[in-house]
Curated annotation (Swiss-Prot):
Residues modified to Phosphoserine: 161, 179
Glycan attachment sites: 143, 161, 178
Domain of life: Eukaryota
Protein name (Swiss-Prot/TrEMBL): Kappa-casein
Signal peptide extent: 1-20
Subcellular location: Secreted
Record keyword Signal present: yes
Chief location bin: secreted
The organism's taxonomic lineage, starting at the top: Eukaryota, Metazoa, Chordata, Craniata, Vertebrata
Length: 185
């Protein structure tokens, strides 16, 4: 890939000169005035960016378009650091030193106050009537459910003997339950 770009660069730089030599061979050798030996209309210079943009798959990734910024620009998110040039033997110097701001900034920065310092006037309350709160949600009280309790009759019936105690219990009847599914034969 690097060799391809090298060949394209060499061709782009030498093409005008090769065209000029071919054109000079066609013209007579005697020139009365000092003029250029090649015509710009016949030899078209193809700049390298045109070659790269005509075939975008060969465009290298490592050419990133970045804006040029000053070293000590106030809008940059980081500072540039430099190593100290002279090192004294007995003094401990930190490994990196921050470059001083040599060039003063041309843009005047206006301080933005913190939101806690901004005074907000309170809202004016006019003719507020107090509305009493009414509890619209009633408390739900559980309803007692009567349970049937078997009662024991302790009364003595004259016809029966005194040994038997009759207890009245509710009668239960059994009902056969049939399934609603119809069986197919």
């Amino acid at each position: 890939m690097k060799s391809f770009f090298l060949v394209v660069n060499i061709l782009a730089l030498t093409l005008p000169f090769l065209g000029a030599e071919v054109q000079n061979q066609e013209q007579p050798t005697c020139h009365k005035n000092d003029e250029r030996f090649f015509d710009l209309k016949t030899v078209k210079y193809i700049p390298i960016y045109y070659v790269l943009n005509s075939s975008p798959r060969y465009e290298p990734i490592y050419y990133q378009h970045r804006l040029a910024l000053l070293i000590n620009n106030q809008h940059m998110p980081y500072q540039y650091y430099a190593r100290p040039a002279a090192v004294r033997p007995h003094v401990q110097i930190p490994q990196w030193q921050v470059l001083p701001n040599i060039y003063p900034s041309t843009v005047v920065r206006h301080p933005c106050p913190h939101p806690s310092f901004i005074a907000i006037p309170p809202k004016k309350l006019q003719e507020i009537t107090v509305i009493p709160k009414i509890n619209t949600i009633a408390t739900v009280e559980p309803t007692p459910i009567p349970t049937p309790e078997p009662t024991v009759n302790n009364a003595v019936i004259p016809d029966a003997s005194s040994e038997f105690i009759i207890a009245s219990t509710p009668e239960t009847t059994t009902v056969p339950v049939t399934s609603p599914v119809v069986q197919k034969l």
